[in-house]
Amino acid sequence: MQKAYTKVEPTTFDEFTATRDQLERVISRLRSPEASNQRHDELESMIHQEGQELCRLLYQAGLDVRSNEEVKREAVTGHDNVVRTYYREGCERQIESMFGEVIYRRKGYSHPQGECLFPLDEALNMPKRKYTYGLRACISLAVCQNAFDASLEGLSTLIEGKIPKRQAQELVSEVSTDFEAFYAQRAITPVQLPGTVLVMSQDGKGIALRHEDLREATRKAAQQEHHTLCTRLSTGEKRNRKRMATVATVYDVAPHVRSAVDVIGRQGEDGKPSRKDAPKAQNKRVWASIEADMERVTEQIVEESLRRDPKRERPWVMLVDGHKDQIKVIKRVFKRHAIKVPLILDFIHVLEYLWRATWCFFDSKDKEQAQAAEHWVLEKAQAILEGRSGPVAAGIRIKAKRCALSAKKQEVIATVANYLTNHTAMLRYDQFMQQGYPIATGVIEGACRHLIADRFEITGARWSLKTAEGILRLRAIRASGDWDRYQAFHKKQEWKRNHLQRFHGPVLAAE
């Protein structure tokens, strides 16, 4: 459908007249008797308000200069090979910028059989919507860190650009649309950090979604629920509200050879254990997806790793938490890519299992027994770090038989012992540490907290799938330190989508 544009007759004027008038107005106010009696915060507020208008007028003048300099063309050819010879001067368009609304004028070329084309739009890379890329980036950065209402309210005190909440939600998806393309093309020098270990890891974290965006099985289970109370959910009735997002990370780390005692800690002079500081993760990338399934995210992990080390010149390791489905998917993807990577079970998860077992033998309310429980956990943990997970599991079973445990506690002991025996190959910590490999998933645990918990759990809201995915992508870009690079890439892709594809070749770039 042909869009309607206002036709304005061209005029000759000094584009910066209004700008100079505004600047003189500010200077005059600063020199006025009233200003002499103002406090510093009142001056600051006035300058901020009037300065925003000055910036808006400067932006308006800059657009006017480009509009007045635009040269009339005999014809413009679109991608449809239709030659547009009908010419219109001064076609207006409203633009919402960080400084407020401005009016943008340009020449249009049309034909009854094709859409109207504006060559100056391509030269200025004008967005498809009325919101400038600067305003979009500002809004996106704010809402990916805080609730939409709070973010928009906070920004309203800093910038003059206005955008409704619904449009802000839509812009999140639009701004994040080039996420995968950005990382697929990103130039990474192979073996950027020679001698380092390439570490991969993934985990899952639930996000509360709207009913229609839950996975089919979860949605069906939610439909079958019957709530006891009308005004609130009872115990156990908050299930089937979330969809699992898969969180992933790839990073480099210097090898860190250590022993079990180094991890557990040697007794210091103050009676507290002292531990060696581990090297920090470098060149870290974290991301998450709630749209893609676990297998697709695992594929992305491999793709990112191959971009970093295509010839497999460095050691690769995969840190896991022991989830059965996770391990099955990882092994399937690795087999498809014909790569062999040692899977390392997160030592922190192992400690959690040991603590579950210890409270079957000790009373947490008794101080002496609680201290004995801590000693027991450290003793078993050191044995596991020394590569003796099998004997530890056997010892736990023997101790359980000697104690008169309840059926519930016996079930806990069986779970812990089976966990250790079923993952023996992933618990060879003595070998892993000797090779300098990491054995804990601190990076991925931090990513789960930063990407998901710190944003999606602050309001208790149910999210739409599209908006949740957009927020995850934007938070991942920022957490990986790629925000500015991504914004530059996104604007270039927008130019290709909105302008280059509409013309028969890049009209202005060819001249």
Where do the protein language model's features map onto the residues?
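Catalytic center-proximal scaffold of phosphoryl-transfer enzymes
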Residues: 1-65, 106-511
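An N-terminal low-complexity regulatory-tail signal and nearby short nucleic-acid-interaction modules
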Residues: 64-128
